[in-house]
């Protein structure tokens, strides 16, 4: 019997102001863990899988139940330790310490590979936490919509003279991460064709407003794309097909999309990528009987897809890796030029990271959408001179359906995170918001990750693989008074390829919270500016000087 599978479970986080825990700090952790498993949020909630292949919120259902039980009794001077999704200890700390400290999927480097992890996973000794799955701050596909939108806007500026009109994007994958691309693309003015092998995922994205139409053949999908481009009204199409097949067929036909990328779960060849010619049912059977054959077939198909991406790039498509490590997988299968197209971070996002700008997010614990709309207005009030940000907030309200507890993603940096958080805390204090707000971010942020094939690819000083930075980030956030802190391995790009940390803090309207918010939400993005200044980026050096950061070696 699989202790991780229970189809009878239907988890919905409590709404309103009635507490089940002893404080809003522990109530927030409980609600956010539960929200990660909401049926409109998680990919396979019955298996505790939130997104990204096998990214889980808890190791098994027994561990989940025990975490909830402990959070309900946890005192204001206690800290719960969670080891790869399993609650292992409660210790006396102090009121400004984190209420929860989480470590997920961490392995000694020599053993940091999928083969060793999968053995531990089968024995019930480990859990893959992805990034925000095991750190309890996933908010559905909205979590990466703005970053994806900003990337596609940057691509239009860089490749199409600033206009995406009549342009279309080819991509793959409609899981928790890939599901953001169709909506982000149409918001940025492109039509989007996304290949997906699991029809239930296409239907889910259509139900939640991320995909407009479904197609069952390439010809049908292309007809939808061409009609939309002629009408001037972008459309997103979910095509029920294998990405490797479709990408290759387009090369054969000589059809060149304007933008080519991919967000299948290529980081996990065993669980995340369906080989060409395989059905979902056959793959599920083979995972139980011959894991090595699954991995080999998946990586061979990834090699086919990457060769097609390279061919489309050579034919003129703006081509980028969107952070799923597909280039690495193809390289290991003999595609020696797999890295000839860039990752999206060095190509389009790094200047933002240099100023500590990244995916800041917050959640209304009340469950009331009005609390989010009021915070949207507060963001506009406090950042009046950023029309692109205002445009994002307007589009988000109009086009993004909340999944689970109402939430908002908003890319802001060192200059703004702390003051926004303090304003939200004041809104809770004066009753403008009906309940406290949870504030967090993706682990994909400026100072919280080491990932040489994604966030830290092609660093100016060659420090791509140095992972001291996310470790220091987690330690500093713990010392600064975050509500819960997490340290993970393997998120986004798979085992052996990344280390990263997460932070969440509660704005409960108290003066004590204000002090913690001011520290955490200054220090956290400041580590990103520090990391990039240390690597030699002038934008980061200037930001550090302007904001008065004390970096002893700056200018040395």
Curated annotation (Swiss-Prot):
Subcellular location: Cytoplasm
Domain of life assignment: Bacteria
Residues annotated as the enzyme's active site: 410
HAMAP family, A to Z: HutU (MF_00577)
Main function: Catalyzes the conversion of urocanate to 4-imidazolone-5-propionate.
PANTHER family: UROCANATE HYDRATASE (PTHR12216:SF4)
Name listed for the protein in its UniProt record: Urocanate hydratase
Organism expressing this protein natively: Shewanella frigidimarina (strain NCIMB 400)
Primary gene name: hutU
